[in-house]
Amino acid sequence: MAFSNALVLCFLLAIINMALPSLATVYTVGDTSGWVIGGDYSTWASDKTFAVGDSLVFNYGAGAHTVDEVKESDYKSCTSGNSISTDSTGATTIPLKKAGKHYFICGVPGHSTGGMKLSIKVKASSGSSAAPSATPSSSGKGSPSSDDTPAATTTTTTPTKQNESSATSLSPIVALFFTVSWICSYVLV
């Protein structure tokens, strides 16, 4: 009986360890509209809290736009010549690996000045419930940042079909809850 309980406990811990990394949120920039000229990305970001471990997915026409992560000064001036990273494949995923301000623009001339720019503040941990911060994309004015060079890597993914929400994080929590409940009821019975 002790061996059986130990085995169930090990299984429970393995399930929890596999589920925890999946609790990060994947945000589709612009929701169903995607990364387009004329999008209001300041409003889009205003009700979201970004945390280290989350990801941004930019969906756009391959070759028609780019996603460039830039420094704050390049964000304000809509300059992509010194981009930290750039991608133009049509489906760009940016993992948020570092806390602080992150700035994104479309590097195609005229697109950033037409509204294709996004500024977000990434929190160190997803456990906090403080309000999100976003710099308005139309004014180009933002508060100074002590960290002008956010570290991020650009990877590409195949676009995924999004339903009503741009963020996905509830189902892993629900799955974890039911798995733990089932295992606990098995151990206690």
Swiss-Prot record:
It comes from the Eukaryota. Residues 1-24 form the signal peptide. Residues 127-165 are annotated as: Disordered. The keyword Cell inner membrane does not apply. Disulfide bonds join C78-C106. One of its GO terms (cellular component) is plasma membrane. SUPFAM superfamilies: Cupredoxins (SSF49503). Residues 25-124 form the Phytocyanin domain. Glycans are attached at N163. One of its GO terms (molecular function) is electron transfer activity. Cu cation binds at H65, C106, H111. The keyword Lipoprotein does not apply. PROSITE patterns: COPPER_BLUE, PHYTOCYANIN. CDD domains: Phytocyanin. Keywords: Copper, Disulfide bond, Electron transport, Glycoprotein, Metal-binding, Signal, Transport. Residues 127-160 have a biased composition (Low complexity). PANTHER family: BLUE COPPER PROTEIN, OS06G0218600 PROTEIN. This is Blue copper protein. It comes from Pisum sativum (Garden pea). The lineage of its organism: Eukaryota, Viridiplantae, Streptophyta, Embryophyta, Tracheophyta.
